[in-house]
Amino acid sequence: VLTFAPFFPEYHPYVDLTGAVLKVVPADTKSFQINFEAFEEMLGPRVAAVLVNTPNNPSGAVYSAETLTKLAQVLTRKAEQYGHDIFLISDEPYREIVFDGKQQPYVSKFYANTISCYSFSKALSLPGERIGYLAVNPACPYAAEIVNMCGQISRGIGHNCPTSLMQLAVSKVLDLTSDFSVYEKNRNLLYECLTDCGFEVVKPEGTFYIFPKAPEADAAAFCQKALQYDLVLVPADSFGCPGYFRMASCIDTE
């Protein structure tokens, strides 16, 4: 399984538990779009799936329609070359949280063998609630088989099943979201402050994270120093981008 840096660190145990191996494509730190040169080099005949996360945790990058079109073209070409399917797993918990009037393109529109994974916890500000859904592109020839298989897995993993009460509650607010304008205001404030202070940072297009480059080589040491100013920062070694750190802005602006 291939994924793109920076990535959510828990992908490692998710993939490891299946008996597969997660390999990380190095980041394009200029934009945090896909590094296609490195991706094509790593997309060998043993790759069964590619895991994407857009809008991205931790960078806040939103993959453009151009990026997703090129990704689909590469996957289609390589699947034909190797003579087997390559699945695209799209992790989409931040799908609605995009800024500047933009929208996150639906990844499944670009590639038939797409499995979309969604969580209500971000759009509804329900941190920690494990409630969402998995959707398979109807154009995927294995859609019915995958849905049935995932249903069996869901019943078997009891610790990750949402309560009936929460399922009923969420069903009543499917057309609602939190007020994302607060996140966008915080994004703008943080970005302006960081750039004014000389930090190197790509302006996030979504999520409630911002991902600056640390002012020293050891990002973990920098984050440790920041604690004395009541700043809880996350060094990005585990995200696949050493030398960077993640800040979250999902709090009151004040």
Describe the function of each predicted region:
Residues 2-254:
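PLP-dependent class I/II
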